């Protein structure tokens, strides 16, 4: 039984930045530091930050006056920003810069009176934040998840229409939805570069290659992690058995029956320590080796807010 490690896997630059923002805020300003929603979708990461004094809340009403609040990597609506501003809360924004790029696309469309179609998953925090960037009462923003949704979609002005997408979607499925939008609305425009982020693309590419060579794929990630779920779905489409697991304790030994080649990857919010835990468990159960696959080098870094770059001296 051999282990094959996908490359790249795990943390992306946006997740690294978001976690660093919370860590630096805790170091510089001391607990409690409030965070709206899970800063990233991973219980291991969130629990570690809680232990250090981060307090995770669903809405700003739970944040006391004169407090520091951090917006999660998934981004927030303009209404949330306005609420924080009106209350005078000190805000550090951990929104991934690639999500902010999509926000700006929606704001530009809104300012021009162009209607917007967002490809994304209903209820995901990133989608809620992106939808909340559109405020033109004469236009509209519409959410679609599938080609079937496009078939049912009716807009006010098909000649002034723009599409964008959640950054963590299936590359293949999103391409199908974009094709359907262009077929139904020939005048629709979109971003010059796909909104799906580099890390999502790279991790899906590595899983596409790995799944063809493995009997089973284990994806380390949270159940509410969009990009982790897309990795599992992609492996299954290719024909591999795939399981999304939070950590090594979730692996069921019967999954590995007759498996000679086991692939392991991790979603963009899953730390490498969890991957290593999976490798160690598989070796306990008889795996002979763990081989790192070649893959695309990722050297992107996103800067944290200036106020958090150097520890303040009192």
UniProtKB/Swiss-Prot annotation:
Binds 1 [4Fe-4S] cluster per subunit. [4Fe-4S] cluster binds at residues 12, 96, 197. The keyword ATP-binding does not apply. The gene is ispH. This is 4-hydroxy-3-methylbut-2-enyl diphosphate reductase. The active site is at residue 126. Catalyzes the conversion of 1-hydroxy-2-methyl-2-(E)-butenyl 4-diphosphate (HMBPP) into a mixture of isopentenyl diphosphate (IPP) and dimethylallyl diphosphate (DMAPP). Acts in the terminal step of the DOXP/MEP pathway for isoprenoid precursor biosynthesis. It comes from the Bacteria. (2E)-4-hydroxy-3-methylbut-2-enyl diphosphate binds at residues 41, 74, 124, 167, 225-227, 269. It holds the Pfam family LYTB. HAMAP family: IspH (MF_00191). It comes from Pseudoalteromonas atlantica (strain T6c / ATCC BAA-1087). Gene3D superfamilies: 3.40.50.11270, 4-hydroxy-3-methylbut-2-enyl diphosphate reductase, catalytic domain.
